[in-house]
């Protein structure tokens, strides 16, 4: 029964105990009261639901096709990587639901994933989007900050602490999560030959990562940093944590192409001639990764691998406007909160993409370009009461001294009025 406005709360809205019986120990908000015991019960119910994220979906485990369809809504292109990831994630969580064993007692091993592709091609976004769809904790780690135990830097166990934090301290939930380790190519050995000097940020880190990636009971310092002999630690089993490693692997395409050219089996002379450096990663083999500097044991822990192609101009244009959470849509709704319409000329969008290509920053650079472009306008607009529209022109993209046009009422609040060409981006498309 709804409580009338102004009616005094006299009991817990859940268990019915009076405020007097509870000694006044209740929390009241918007006419609803809850006592400590009911609050505790609600907390435990939520915790139980979160600790079984895979069971919380009404339709059970999403199929690989459903996972790819979800990725298509958020990530442009990269069809091969989407399929590989969708199948790998589906198999991983199917394995967990079966308690790692099949009917005849066969134990199914974990298959971690390696993504190879240039900066800004979507590696992190793919992993993050899948984790969100699977409703599991997700953490990102940077391999360049890791060093071998005993040296200045970050212990590999600290990446597990990030996952525990993402699970709000629930270790059992974290044990079903996903960790994305970026810049994994930066911990490659300096050369193929074993060195007599210590490579504390290369081979040493690979060795340290081996156990937690394949599955072990790890002890994590609760405050991060180095482990101390007398400090309490958090125990976490990594057997069911999915590790996705990614990196640009600059120069790997040459290693693949050289191997193919030297091979006398499997490729005709015409096929070899048609294999370009930018497409050679399609033929990536484990031996190429070892040649690059990853140790064989580490490569063996990443049996599933896929490559991401460098994004072209058409891809970047689509990334700006097509995905459900595209950058342009985000800025459009940001301005809409101030009752201002944000409009881009078509050639302005093309100029933004051209700048990202020139800087070689991929999709990641689009946001920083837009942020710099709209910075002054976002500062001015909230103070102008009659602002109706902001128009981003090609000139404002190419010339940092020119700001986008601001329409106040029906007049342009800038001296460089010109004919406008609006592009229909279907901002409100759901």
UniProtKB/Swiss-Prot annotation:
Instruction: Extract the InterPro entries matched here.
Output: AAA+_ATPase, ATP-dep_Clp_protease_ClpX, ATPase_AAA_core, Clp_ATPase_C, Clp_protease_ATP-bd_su_ClpX, ClpA/B, ClpX_bact, P-loop_NTPase
Note the SUPFAM superfamilies from the entry: P-loop containing nucleoside triphosphate hydrolases (SSF52540)
Which intervals hold domain ClpX-type ZB?
1-54
Residues binding ATP: 118-125
Entry binding sites for Zn(2+): 12, 15, 35, 38
Superkingdom is Bacteria
Any Gene Ontology CC annotation = HslUV protease complex
Keywords assigned by UniProt? ATP-binding, Chaperone, Metal-binding, Nucleotide-binding, Zinc
GO MF terms held by the record: ATP binding; ATP hydrolysis activity; ATP-dependent protein folding chaperone; protein dimerization activity; unfolded protein binding; zinc ion binding
Instruction: Describe its partners and assembly state.
Output: Component of the ClpX-ClpP complex. Forms a hexameric ring that, in the presence of ATP, binds to fourteen ClpP subunits assembled into a disk-like structure with a central cavity, resembling the structure of eukaryotic proteasomes.
What this chain does, per the entry, is described as: ATP-dependent specificity component of the Clp protease. It directs the protease to specific substrates. Can perform chaperone functions in the absence of ClpP.
Spell out the family assignment given in the record's similarity comment: Belongs to the ClpX chaperone family.
What name does UniProt use for this protein?
ATP-dependent Clp protease ATP-binding subunit ClpX
What is the source species? Borrelia garinii subsp. bavariensis (strain ATCC BAA-2496 / DSM 23469 / PBi)
């Amino acid at each position: 029964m709804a409580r009338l406005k102004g009616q005094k709360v006299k009991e817990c809205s859940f268990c019915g105990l009076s405020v007097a019986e509870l000694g006044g120990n209740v929390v009241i908000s918007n006419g609803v009261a809850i006592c400590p015991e009911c609050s505790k019960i609600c907390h435990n119910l939520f915790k139980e639901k979160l600790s079984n994220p895979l069971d919380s979906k009404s339709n059970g485990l999403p199929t690989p096709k459903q996972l790819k369809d979800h990725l298509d809504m958020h990530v442009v292109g990269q069809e091969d990587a989407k399929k590989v990831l969708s199948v790998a994630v589906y198999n991983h969580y199917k394995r967990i639901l079966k308690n790692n064993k099949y009917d005849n007692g066969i134990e199914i091993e974990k298959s971690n994933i390696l993504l190879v592709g240039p900066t800004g091609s979507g590696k992190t976004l793919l992993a993050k989007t899948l984790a969100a769809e699977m409703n599991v904790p997700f953490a990102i780690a940077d391999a360049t900050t890791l060093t071998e135990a005993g040296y200045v830097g970050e212990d590999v166990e600290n990446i597990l602490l990030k996952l525990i934090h993402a699970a709000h301290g629930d270790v059992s939930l974290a044990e079903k999560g996903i960790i994305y380790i970026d810049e994994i190519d930066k911990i490659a050995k300096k050369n193929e030959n074993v060195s007599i000097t210590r490579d504390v940020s290369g081979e040493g880190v690979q060795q340290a990562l081996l156990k937690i990636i394949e599955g072990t009971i790890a002890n994590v310092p609760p405050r991060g940093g180095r482990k101390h002999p007398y400090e309490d630690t958090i125990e976490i089993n990594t057997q069911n944590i999915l590790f996705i490693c990614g990196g640009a692997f600059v120069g790997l395409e040459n290693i693949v192409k050289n191997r193919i050219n030297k091979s006398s089996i499997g490729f005709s002379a015409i096929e070899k001639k048609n294999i370009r450096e930018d497409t050679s990663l399609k033929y990536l083999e484990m031996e190429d990764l070892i040649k690059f500097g990853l140790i064989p044991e580490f490569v063996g822990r990443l049996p599933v691998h896929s490559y991401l192609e460098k994004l072209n101009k058409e891809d970047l244009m689509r990334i700006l406007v097509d995905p459900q959470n595209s950058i342009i849509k985000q800025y459009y709704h940001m301005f809409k909160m101030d009752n201002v319409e944000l409009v881009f000329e078509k050639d302005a969008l093309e100029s933004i993409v051209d700048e990202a290509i020139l800087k070689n920053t991929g999709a990641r650079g689009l946001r920083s370009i837009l942020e710099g472009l709209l910075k002054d306008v976002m500062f001015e607009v909230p103070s102008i009461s009659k602002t109706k529209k902001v128009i981003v022109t090609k000139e404002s993209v190419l010339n940092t001294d020119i700001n986008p046009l601001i329409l106040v009422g029906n007049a342009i609040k800038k001296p460089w009025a010109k004919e406008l060409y609006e592009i229909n981006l279907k901002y409100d498309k759901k």
